[in-house]
């Protein structure tokens, strides 16, 4: 966009935009700043990237779902409009531990040469795309989908390198009528995970929740007041969202 703007100079320019989903054409006249660069007074975000967790993969269709919540603009908190995207392998290099009032995060590197497959949608219930049948990251046995109940459960998460481990959690409460993906309250009880991360941190979104040998949901949010507690989305809600993209 910048290169086109500089080529056009200060001549009036027609921009085709979308405002709340509706197309709109605007005419703008660029101005030169103190450095002589043509500007239109708009902050344009053309891409973003982050670490998250793949929740499920269907070998029959190649479809996958991740995060359990949408990717939002960090300033407006609005769901980011989706153009195109890819899923890349990442390696966790460090952890900023979560604490009361401060969300932690996983920090790592992306393998930019390892494009695993395209994303096709960014929704309130997760991001969705496809992986090839020979994807080497897919391993293990398939699990049936089930409904969460209050009680002990586990999550699978990668908080160091590329190793996925299973950690103990407790499903404290089900919130089946929640409309924002916060359909259950969970508490991390595994001492190893608490020691490593302080509880739930950014980057663990999408970590699958397993209970009684079934896939019942995914981790979505952390409680800022207590990093050992957070929310999860039910697997049924996430799968329904994936089928409708």
Predicted feature locations:
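Short, Lys/Arg- and Gly-enriched loop/turn segments at beta-strand edges
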Residues: 1-4, 24-26, 164-167, 225-229
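Terminal peptide-recognition signature
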Residues: 15, 54, 209, 213
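PDZ-domain C-terminal substructure recognizer with occasional recognition of PDZ-binding tails
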Residues: 2-40
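Short, solvent-exposed secondary-structure boundary/capping segments
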Residues: 37-42, 179-185
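Charged, low-complexity helical/coil segments in non-catalytic cytosolic or luminal regions
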Residues: 19, 47, 55-183, 192, ...
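Catalytic nucleophile loop of clan PA
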Residues: 197-218
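Generic structural signal for well-ordered beta-strand positions
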Residues: 24, 65, 216-217
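C-terminal subregion of chymotrypsin/trypsin-like serine protease catalytic domains
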Residues: 214-245
């Amino acid at each position: 966009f910048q290169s086109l703007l500089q080529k056009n100079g200060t001549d009036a320019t027609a921009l085709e935009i979308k405002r709340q989903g509706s197309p709109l054409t605007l005419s703008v006249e660029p101005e030169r700043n103190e450095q002589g660069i043509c500007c239109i007074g708009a902050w344009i975000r053309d891409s973003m990237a982050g670490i998250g967790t793949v929740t499920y993969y269907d070998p029959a269709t190649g479809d996958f779902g991740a995060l359990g919540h949408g990717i939002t603009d960090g300033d407006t908190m609005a769901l980011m409009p989706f153009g195109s995207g890819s899923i890349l392998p990442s390696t966790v290099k460090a952890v900023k531990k979560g604490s009361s009032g401060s969300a932690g995060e996983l920090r790592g590197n992306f393998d930019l040469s390892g494009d695993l497959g395209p994303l096709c949608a960014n929704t309130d219930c997760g991001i969705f795309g496809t992986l090839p049948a020979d994807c080497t990251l897919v391993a293990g046995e398939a699990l049936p989908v089930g409904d969460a109940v209050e009680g002990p459960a586990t999550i699978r998460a990668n908080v160091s390198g590329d190793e996925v481990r299973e950690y103990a959690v407790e499903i404290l409460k089900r919130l089946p009528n929640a409309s924002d993906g916060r359909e259950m309250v969970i508490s991390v009880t595994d001492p190893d995970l608490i020691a490593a991360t302080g509880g739930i941190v950014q980057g663990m979104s999408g970590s699958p929740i397993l209970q009684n040998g079934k896939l019942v949901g995914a981790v979505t949010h952390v409680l800022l007041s207590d990093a050992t507690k957070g929310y999860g989305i039910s697997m049924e809600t996430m799968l329904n969202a994936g089928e409708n993209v």
